[in-house]
């Protein structure tokens, strides 16, 4: 029996990507290298199909329950689209750490930070699963990014260890719906393929990891079940126990 034909390559200048999956960090990085300069305005195209993505971002950030002076880590911060909303909550006495795989997206974020004169922002180029959270984090946010990381469970586990008592991890992302729209999966994935989403990525379920690592958990869906906001909150016993465990391991 002859071998099955591989996926059709797509010419992209520097390298050929495939139509199957953008799952490796290298492939995701390449997608956002090419999209970085135009990312901010390109995402607005989804308003044409009724996807009010800014409304979901605001709702996710509100769910963090931030106070002035808070330390926030944003995983997959991209060009820093969420920074203004986060800064409005934490103020200049707070600290904002933006983590992203793409150096090109981070360059756009640096320009945003400089233009606004934010002196409390630290930008880190790293794969999400390889990033080591600082201790004493008040909140962790990821919007439309964590599902692109195959090792998302590691990210959530590390975040749970770093969060203070009462600290929250808020996850806003796309998902495969559990309704009739599931039959339209190939078309739905096609709509978000420009942002490195594949069918395999869409089937990932990081909200279940959030539920597993946090005893306090809430979940809500929107946009016909295609988008969700999940919140995990660290209680005092968990925070104390996990921080002690981390100290023992480091000893």
Please give the residue ranges for each predicted region.
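Conserved class I S-adenosyl-L-methionine
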Residues: 14-65, 81, 85, 108, ...
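Helix-to-beta-strand junctions that scaffold the AdoMet/dcAdoMet cofactor pocket
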Residues: 91, 149-150, 163-164
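A short SAM/SAH-binding and catalytic strip from SAM-dependent methyltransferases
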Residues: 138-152
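Core SAM-dependent methyltransferase catalytic element
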Residues: 213-251
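Class I SAM-dependent methyltransferase SAM/SAH-binding core
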Residues: 73-130
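A short glycine-rich, Lys/Arg-flanked "PGG" loop and its adjoining helix->strand segment in the class I
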Residues: 153-165
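C-terminal alpha-helical "lid/dimerization" subdomain adjacent to the S-adenosyl-L-methionine
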Residues: 26-27, 49, 170-226
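A short acidic, Gly/Pro-enriched loop at the edge of an enzyme's catalytic core
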Residues: 129-140
């Amino acid at each position: 029996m002859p071998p099955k034909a591989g996926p059709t390559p797509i010419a992209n200048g520097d390298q050929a990507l495939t139509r199957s999956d953008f799952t490796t960090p290298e492939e995701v990085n390449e997608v956002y290298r090419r999209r970085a300069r135009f990312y901010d305005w390109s995402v607005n195209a989804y308003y044409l199909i009724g996807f009010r993505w800014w409304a979901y971002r605001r709702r996710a950030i509100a769910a963090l329950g931030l106070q002035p002076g808070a330390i926030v880590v944003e995983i997959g911060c991209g060009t820093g689209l969420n920074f203004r909303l986060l800064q409005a909550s934490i103020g200049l006495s707070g600290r904002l750490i933006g983590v992203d795989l793409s150096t090109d997206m981070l360059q756009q974020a640096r320009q945003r930070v400089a233009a606004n004169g934010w002196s409390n922002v630290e930008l880190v180029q790293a794969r999400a699963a390889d990033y080591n959270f600082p201790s004493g984090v008040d909140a962790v946010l990821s919007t439309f990014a964590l599902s692109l990381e195959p090792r998302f469970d590691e990210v959530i586990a590390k975040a749970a260890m770093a969060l203070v008592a009462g600290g929250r991890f808020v996850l806003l992302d796309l998902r495969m719906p559990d309704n009739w729209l599931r039959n339209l999966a190939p078309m739905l994935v096609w709509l978000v393929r420009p942002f490195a989403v594949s069918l395999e990525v869409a089937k990932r379920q990081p909200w279940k990891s959030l539920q597993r690592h946090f005893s306090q958990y809430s979940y809500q869906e929107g946009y016909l079940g295609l988008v969700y906001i999940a919140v995990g909150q660290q209680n005092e016993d968990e925070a104390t126990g996990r921080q002690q465990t981390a100290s023992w391991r480091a000893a």
